[in-house]
A protein has these predicted regions:
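Acidic/aromatic-lined carbohydrate-recognition and catalytic surfaces
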Residues: 20-161
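Positively charged n-region of N-terminal signal peptides that target proteins for export
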Residues: 1-4
């Protein structure tokens, strides 16, 4: 039965027309920004959203039409900001949610695109979803968000992603 399903899906996949990249993406010149080390606007030694915004003219002048910003969301920063604790708020070291909205608007006003590095594949162990999932395997809302094993030494054998 598995072979029938596999062969059927394989044959059907050949019928589906391949999607093309958007025209703008085919010719995109992407500039990645790690916010903490890019441009500090307030003198605290950490780059921030206002610092990025202040450099948009320069970024555009070197031929960039797309900016990719590494994670700016609340984090414990054990993993360079990739250990997100809150996907809904900008980490205070970088600024505020309204400053992020302003940055996106300014990027668009200058005719550029912006990619936000959203780290949806993993979170901090301080993230509310992780903490809720950790409480019990019967927590229906969060129990499937993470893979758990009964042992501290045994690692999960089959990762979903």
């Amino acid at each position: 039965m598995k072979w029938i399903i596999f062969v059927s899906l394989f044959l059907v996949s050949g019928i589906v027309k391949a999607q093309h990249l958007p025209q703008w993406l085919e010719k995109a010149v992407v500039y990645q920004i790690y916010p903490a080390s890019f441009k500090d606007s307030d003198g605290d030694g950490i780059g921030d959203l206002k610092g990025i915004e202040s450099q948009l003219d320069y970024i555009k002048s070197i031929g960039v039409n797309t900016i990719w910003i590494s994670p700016v969301f609340s984090s414990e920063f054990f993993d360079g900001g990739y250990d997100v604790t809150d996907f809904y708020s900008v980490d205070e070291r970088y600024g505020t949610n309204s400053q992020l909205v302003s940055l996106v608007q300014k990027v668009h006003e200058k005719g550029m695109k912006i990619f936000m590095d959203l780290v949806a594949g993993h979170t901090s162990d301080k993230h509310p979803w992780f903490l809720q999932s950790k409480q019990s395997d019967t927590n229906l809302q969060y129990s499937d968000y993470f893979i758990w094993t009964p042992s501290k030494t045994e690692k999960p054998k089959q990762f979903v992603s």
